[in-house]
Amino acid sequence: MDGQMNVVEHWNIAVQELSERDKILKNIISNYRGERLKLKSDGFLTLARAIVGQQISVKAADTIWKRLEITANGNISRSRIRELSTEELRKTGLSSQKTSYIRNIAESEVLGTDWDECSDEKITELLCTIKGIGKWTAEMFLIFHLARPNVLPLADIGLIRAIEKNYNDGNGMSKEQFDGLGQKWSPWCTVTTWYLWRSLDPIPVEY
């Protein structure tokens, strides 16, 4: 099981408001009507997938993830990861470091937190206490598991590339320019991020 659910309650209103205030984004959105962010109901899956995807291509990450699914007999869960040996995990293509990080997440008690009671900043702080999780991975958790509406992961190379391509003819941009766009897109930066990713990738980004 993949632990997926698909409901993002604020999606339609976000699309409407963003389309009204940003013509460039409106054109991007119009190219992908009927598509939207797919959420993961299991936060462990989001974190594990994000670890797998660190510093490698989407295609390479997808290949490793499929091997991991086979190794885990279709059940990538905290308990199943704890049962698998390091050798079994490494055979999927995971580096020793990523194997260690995924084990850390599987064993962490932080995932038992009531996230509804936490701000985005508090969630990021808690997740970053787990070795292997940094701000980017925490942001993927906020987007793909919790559907927090206003996440703009500016440490994400793909997002930076998409913004520069669509808003500055592929040329580099300053922090002030990125911050200005973030203010324009707020409070719907998550929806913006998804469509900008989608404008670059042949398949939707998923964590």
Annotate each PLM feature:
Residues 13, 20-50, 55-66, 70-72:
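A positional/architectural concept
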Residues 1-35, 100, 117-122, 135-207:
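C-terminal accessory module of base-excision DNA glycosylases/AP lyases that mediates lesion recognition
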Residues 24, 28, 56-57, 61-129, ...:
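Alpha-helical ds-nucleic-acid-binding substructure associated with the helix-hairpin-helix region
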Residues 37-45, 93-96, 182-189:
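Structural motif
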Residues 46-51, 67, 84-88, 122-126, ...:
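A general alpha-helix detector
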Residues 108, 130, 146-150:
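Histidine/lysine/aspartate-rich catalytic loop segments that bind and position anionic ligands
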